[in-house]
């Protein structure tokens, strides 16, 4: 008997591990109009779902526990004792009051901007929240200080090179220092270079750096209550304020400026909405503090991981918001809480850096009438993305046993430090 060739057949879908959909696809349209879908479930059914009671209470059974024996017994239920009242308030173990019972709770919500808020639209969103007109570049007065050789250090370029090398190469014994290490060191070295100008200008000694201070500023913008509060950057205070940067003609010209909107995105999309708050305006310093005028606000983005650092656009928005907050808090101390156009505008500067890339900002508060989009607006000058150096070679580059790129600082740009120094000297020279 001749053998027939074996015919290979493909196995069915269910035996190959492929899940097939039985029957026709489910309809994706709206739900059918029934009493449950139009008016909701009946009250008795809804109460049965919402009120989650133990099974023993639902069937009305007595619970037998091991409370009388005072030790665990298998098969008996765990006893439930009433909350123990210790007779005094323990702050670590006492439950706080409910939000509804807090004395500071209000029906109207407030949108909070704190140091961890990242603006989705960046500077445009901060402009709308602060009613501010943007001017690209630094003011002419600051640029004139930066370009004048009389306001520079002796051997300034070499001093800046040593400061960068100290932060990136010499400060640590690690092969490549972390950003959280070299960024604060570089900031301290640059501030030290700026302080050396106090020999030539003694009024620079009447300044003070403040860390870990808290600010609070409240304002209303188109029926929305906003507030800036909490910790922010390192603030340099002075005994005298910075004179206004823009002239009266430039301030009056801001009436014709139209603020940019980004509909359908809400300007408060990134802010934290709370109902327990206090409408507070506080500069963070007590009355009688001699260094009472904010001068420059410094932000250090020194996180090692890139997702934990603010992007340059978000950092500029953060600088604008907190420069505005410091200026608004100071304005309400000087002129009161009534919305008005300020007789003497308040100027606050800000510098942000991640240890290599610098952002410069000058903000001038012209008005505290921020409800509507009409009228005089505030002004801000921003000079963005200024590299102090291109790269720092911590480990020499070797090819075929030949050092092709030794360790050192490459691509130093002294113009960036000139702007840093000009903002430090602004208001004194």
Swiss-Prot record:
Q: Where is the composition biased (Pro residues)?
A: 22-33
Under which name does UniProt file this protein?
A: Large ribosomal subunit protein mL37
Point out the gene that encodes the protein: MRPL37
Q: Pfam families, alphabetically? A: PDCD9 (PF07147)
Q: Which organism is it from?
A: Gallus gallus
Question: Chief subcellular site?
Answer: mitochondrion
Which portions of the sequence form the region Disordered?
12-45
Q: Which UniProt keywords apply?
A: Mitochondrion, Ribonucleoprotein, Ribosomal protein, Transit peptide
Asked if the keyword DNA-binding belongs to this entry, the reply reads no
Q: Which InterPro entries match?
A: mtLSU_mL37, Ribosomal_mL37/mL65
- Where exactly is the transit peptide annotated in this entry? 1-29
Coiled coil ranges? none
One GO term in the molecular function aspect is:
structural constituent of ribosome
- One GO CC annotation: mitochondrial large ribosomal subunit
Give the family from UniProt: Belongs to the mitochondrion-specific ribosomal protein mL37 family.
The subcellular localization recorded is: Mitochondrion
Partners and quaternary state? Component of the mitochondrial ribosome large subunit (39S) which comprises a 16S rRNA and about 50 distinct proteins.
């Amino acid at each position: 008997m001749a053998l027939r060739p074996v015919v290979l057949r493909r196995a069915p879908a269910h035996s190959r591990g492929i899940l097939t959909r039985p029957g026709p696809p489910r309809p994706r349209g709206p739900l059918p109009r029934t009493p449950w879908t139009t008016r909701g479930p009946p009250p008795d059914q809804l109460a049965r779902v919402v009120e989650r009671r133990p099974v023993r209470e639902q069937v009305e059974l007595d619970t037998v526990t091991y409370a009388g024996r005072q030790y665990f017994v298998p098969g008996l239920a765990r006893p439930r004792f009433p909350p123990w009242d210790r007779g005094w308030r323990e702050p670590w173990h006492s439950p706080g009051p409910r939000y509804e019972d807090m004395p500071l709770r209000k029906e109207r919500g407030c949108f909070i901007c704190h140091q961890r808020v990242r603006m989705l639209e960046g500077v445009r969103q901060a402009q709308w929240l602060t009613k501010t007109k943007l001017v690209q570049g630094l003011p002419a007065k600051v640029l004139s200080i930066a370009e004048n050789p009389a306001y520079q250090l002796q051997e300034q370029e070499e001093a800046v090179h040593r400061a960068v090398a100290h932060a990136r190469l010499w400060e640590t014994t690690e092969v490549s220092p972390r950003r959280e290490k070299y960024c604060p060191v570089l900031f301290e070295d640059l501030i030290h270079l700026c302080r050396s100008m106090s020999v030539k200008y003694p009024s620079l000694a009447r300044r003070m750096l403040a860390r870990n201070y808290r600010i609070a500023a409240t304002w209303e913008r188109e029926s929305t209550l906003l507030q800036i509060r909490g910790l922010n950057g390192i603030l340099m205070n002075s005994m005298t304020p910075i004179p206004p940067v823009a002239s009266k003609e430039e301030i009056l010209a801001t009436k014709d400026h139209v603020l940019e909107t980004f509909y359908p995105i809400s300007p408060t999309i990134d802010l934290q909405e709370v109902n327990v708050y206090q409408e507070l305006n506080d500069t963070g310093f007590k009355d009688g503090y001699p260094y009472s005028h904010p001068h420059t606000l410094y932000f250090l983005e020194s996180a090692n991981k890139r997702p934990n650092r603010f992007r340059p656009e978000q950092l500029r928005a953060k600088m604008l918001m907190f420069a505005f907050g410091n200026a608004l808090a100071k304005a309400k101390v000087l002129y009161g809480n009534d919305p008005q156009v300020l007789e003497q505008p308040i100027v606050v500067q800000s510098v942000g850096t991640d240890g290599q890339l610098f952002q410069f900002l000058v903000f001038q508060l012209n008005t505290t009438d921020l409800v509507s989009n009409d009228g005089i607006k505030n002004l801000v000058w921003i000079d963005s993305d200024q590299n102090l150096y291109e790269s720092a070679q911590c480990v020499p580059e070797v090819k075929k046993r030949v050092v092709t790129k030794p360790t050192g600082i490459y691509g130093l740009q002294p113009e960036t430090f000139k702007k840093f120094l000009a903002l430090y000297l602004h208001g004194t020279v």
